[in-house]
Amino acid sequence: MDIKAKIEKLLAKTIENGCTVEEAASAAKMVQRLIGKYHIELAEVGNETETADGEVLDAKSVRKWEIRLISTIARNMRCEAIVSHRYTAGNINRKSFVYIVGMDADRKAVILLYEKLRKICKVGMRKEQNYHKSMYGNAKGIADSYGFGFTMAIKEEMTKQAKALVLVKPKEVDDKVQELFPNVKTRRVNVSCNAHAYDSGMSDGHSAMSVSAIE
């Protein structure tokens, strides 16, 4: 079974068919470990022949918290996520594209894991929105606040394990980024958050990543 098939099998259980949020989210660490083991085995037999490349994340629109989530996952799994903006209709309408740059197996793992964690985050997000609607009559800004909190928790947990597994981004990935996006710049995303929603998202993210129910 190839690495992509193993990851797909690992992430096959979904919330919709009976897997809990916590069980599904704990797969993130398992995917990281699988990627780490995969590259160690290739190195041991001298067969690490993959080359870095980029592919577009299939998404109609991307919110700021989703950009941070995909960037977090990519950087902790030997890849980079680049956001590119294109204007249409006389430079009036802007569409954002997210490119994942990395080795083939790593890219596939990043995209699969992002799609899984994004779904999980949205489940908690809806609960938080419903809470604020019932308590305060509206949920303005709650979704993004929860999303940023959730993403921060994922970042802390995945960064910790990436260091333990020595998941180092190959130089070829940085070279490919420069080839594809020679004018790329790093920009800081500043947002104002609802403290309760942010803390709820962060708590749920940490709880999900620490559960070993499907290990």
Language-model-derived ranges and their functions:
Residues 47-215:
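Extended, helix-rich structural scaffolds rather than catalytic motifs
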Residues 1-52:
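Long alpha-helical, hydrophobic tracts
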